[in-house]
């Protein structure tokens, strides 16, 4: 009678010790409220136009093609669409956001604004851009692009100063020098307007170096002035180098309002596109899958640099990307990572996704959701789960009590039997 509860308790402990719930290297979701942004490796529409139709082109499981939870474009990326004429209007909304894109702007494309420019600066721009995107999509549900209207009162038009190969920069726009100016030592302005979104990601860029034109060197200077609040955002060139520099961009998160773009020297730049952020949500870390080429092409790690906890979880394969459709499409390792989108999972962490929320031999780092051996503790802005020792303490107390009872009963029966034998 006394042994039954202890037997059940010990059986439960043994069962839990034999249960394995390691973190898995996948991206997943808590429920159906999720969205994926991608490129050709998750572009179902692109596969439909191939002849013959071949879903091995993708790393995404074809079962998700009709989900309505994917915004992907072959040959493109959010960064590429943000800055260049090669544009796709990425649009999506969800509580849990996943990104699997970025490979379509890498050192392989070798983009730089001028022949003496630097692709390294553009890789830096890419990292800064995705840092803002990932941070903000941890607190916003909706992402899309919007055009930014501007008014310039001069007669000069925007110019394609910054271009390389098939890529032509059009965000921000360069306003050409007025015909009556003999050099670039002049001040010029343009009005632009942000409306319809909660917040916007816009570029503020300068040539950070000595820009040579007709034997004269110029220092770039660009400002945005919020005419409603009086806040000024600005960049001035600080480098003295004359070669090997390029277009340095900062990515500002701005509210709706009326703005003035100001140039004190060199060409005026004005934003023409913005990332539109809408519908604030409870903090939910985004998930990013490494987007890279087969080793035959040069890739970068800028999405990994941008994706940092607690706002972002980064997933990567441990092997070279080797596709089955071609070397850059249909890799088994990345297909495995995306397979987690086929099911719900209760817990996310820096190490991976936990399939069960009961116990695990691995301590979840930066956990989110219903995590193994954990309880939800809600802080004002960042819901996290932390270890709860109460169940283990209770088990220890019960085991201690059980041992004491067994010892007492054994002593009692030993003494009682000894007394009976002595009396006999």
Curated annotation (Swiss-Prot):
Region feature Esterase domain 1, mapped onto this chain: 7-127
Keywords: Disulfide bond, Glycoprotein, Hemagglutinin, Host cell membrane, Host membrane, Hydrolase, Membrane, Signal, Transmembrane, Transmembrane helix, Viral envelope protein, Virion
Signal peptide: 1-16
Annotated disulfide bonds: 44-65, 113-162, 197-276, 205-249, 307-312, 347-371
Gene encoding the protein: HE
Segments crossing the lipid bilayer: 393-413
Compartment(s) of residence: Virion membrane; Host cell membrane
Active site: residue positions: 40, 326, 329
Family designation: Belongs to the influenza type C/coronaviruses hemagglutinin-esterase family.
Region Receptor binding: start-end pairs: 128-266
GO molecular function: host cell surface receptor binding; sialate 4-O-acetylesterase activity; sialate 9-O-acetylesterase activity; sialate O-acetylesterase activity
Annotated membrane topology: Single-pass type I membrane protein
Lineage: superkingdom: Viruses
Broad enzyme group: hydrolase
InterPro entries: Capsid_hemagglutn, HEMA, Hemagglutn-estrase_core, Hemagglutn-estrase_hemagglutn
GO cellular component, one term: virion membrane
Job of this protein: Structural protein that makes short spikes at the surface of the virus. Contains receptor binding and receptor-destroying activities. Mediates de-O-acetylation of N-acetyl-4-O-acetylneuraminic acid, which is probably the receptor determinant recognized by the virus on the surface of erythrocytes and susceptible cells. This receptor-destroying activity is important for virus release as it probably helps preventing self-aggregation and ensures the efficient spread of the progeny virus from cell to cell.
Name listed for the protein in its UniProt record: Hemagglutinin-esterase
One GO BP: fusion of virus membrane with host plasma membrane
Assembly and oligomerization: Homodimer; disulfide-linked. Forms a complex with the M protein in the pre-Golgi. Associates then with S-M complex to form a ternary complex S-M-HE.
Catalytic activity annotation: N-acetyl-9-O-acetylneuraminate + H2O = N-acetylneuraminate + acetate + H(+); N-acetyl-4-O-acetylneuraminate + H2O = N-acetylneuraminate + acetate + H(+)
Topological domains, Intravirion: 414-424
Virion surface compartment segments: 17-392
EC number(s) from the headed UniProt entry: 3.1.1.53
Glycan attachment points: 54, 89, 153, 236, 301, 316, 358, 417
Post-translational modification: N-glycosylated in the host RER.
Region listing for Esterase domain 2, in residue ranges: 267-379
């Amino acid at each position: 009678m006394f042994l039954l509860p202890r037997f059940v308790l010990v059986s439960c402990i043994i069962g839990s010790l034999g249960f394995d719930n390691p973190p898995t290297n996948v991206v997943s979701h808590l429920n159906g409220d999720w969205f994926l942004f991608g490129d050709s490796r998750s572009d179902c529409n692109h596969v439909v136009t191939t002849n013959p139709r071949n879903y091995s082109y993708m790393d995404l499981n074809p079962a998700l093609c009709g989900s309505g939870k994917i915004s992907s474009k072959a040959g493109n990326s959010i960064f590429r669409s943000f800055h260049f004429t090669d544009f796709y209007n990425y649009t999506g909304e969800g509580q849990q956001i996943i990104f699997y894109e970025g490979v379509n702007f890498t050192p392989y494309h070798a983009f730089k604004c001028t022949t003496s420019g630097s692709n390294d600066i553009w890789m830096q721009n890419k990292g800064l851009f995705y840092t803002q995107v990932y941070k903000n999509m941890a607190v916003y549900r909706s992402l899309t692009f919007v055009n930014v209207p501007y008014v310039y009162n001069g007669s000069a038009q925007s110019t394609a100063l910054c271009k390389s190969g098939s890529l032509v920069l059009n965000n921000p726009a360069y306003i050409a020098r007025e015909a009556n100016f003999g050099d670039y030592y002049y001040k010029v302005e343009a009005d632009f307007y942000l409306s319809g979104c909660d917040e916007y990601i816009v570029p503020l860029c300068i040539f950070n170096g000595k820009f040579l034109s007709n034997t004269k060197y110029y220092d770039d200077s660009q400002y945005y002035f919020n005419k409603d609040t009086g806040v000024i955002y600005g960049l001035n060139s600080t480098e003295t180098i004359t070669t090997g520099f390029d277009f340095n961009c900062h990515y500002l998160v701005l509210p709706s309002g009326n703005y003035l773009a100001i140039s004190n020297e060199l060409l005026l730049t004005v934003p023409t596109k913005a990332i539109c952020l809408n519908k604030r949500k409870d903090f939910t870390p985004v998930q990013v899958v490494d987007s890279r080429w087969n080793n035959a092409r040069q890739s970068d790690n800028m999405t990994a640099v941008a994706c940092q906890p607690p706002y972002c979880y980064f997933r990567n394969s441990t092997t070279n990307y080797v596709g089955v459709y071609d070397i850059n499409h249909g890799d088994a390792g990345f297909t495995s990572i995306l397979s987690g989108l086929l099911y719900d999972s209760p817990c996310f962490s820096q190490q991976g996704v936990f399939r069960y929320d009961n116990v695990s031999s691995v301590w979840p780092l930066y956990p989110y959701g219903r995590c193994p051996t954990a309880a939800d503790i809600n802080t004002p802005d960042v819901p996290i789960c932390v270890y709860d020792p109460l169940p283990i303490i209770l088990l220890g107390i019960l085991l201690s009590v059980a041992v004491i009872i067994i010892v007492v009963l054994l002593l009692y029966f030993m003494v009682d039997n000894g007394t009976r034998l002595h009396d006999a």
